[in-house]
Amino acid sequence: MRLKYLFKIQNIIDNEIRRICQEDGSVIDRVYLIKTQILALEVKTGELANITKCYKYPQQMKAVEKRKLIIRYVDCFKFLLSIGNDNQFNVVNFSVKELIESVTKEPCETIVDVFLSLFDHISNLKRDLVTENYISGMGVYMTIFKEFVLIGQLLGLTFEDVFEYYDNIYRDMVHKAEPPAER
């Protein structure tokens, strides 16, 4: 499944970052890591909202170059995947196709509504992870994931766009980290 591949790529990236931090003698405590990941996700999500200018009143959203949107979207997505990996939410076997279909069937909200809901849910996720309430956290994580899919749709992005961009940027890193195939 392609989503599992993205979780795998992000795990390789995160492990390399941790390796470098350990060489520096840095020790990262669990709660600090959660808080920094959540803050990074909020900042990157804010940058995505900013590039769309969806918050400007009474302007209509102006078209933004698709590549810029994908770059900002993937910046958010990386932190979402990292949080999933670090809290074992990556084991949930959900199909991107089913996720997209469920988002499409829901009543259409404005992008502003989705961003606001997303920020609320990100805060809820922080609370659940810091207090080690992983069952609630898993549900909130799935909601956040769904909201990211919806934002992508509202911006005209497909999962294919996101996958291709992510894969093109990080493919070499993954292949270097994988052990050679056995014969």
Each model region followed by its residue ranges:
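Flexible "arm" and connector segments at domain edges
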Residues: M1-R183
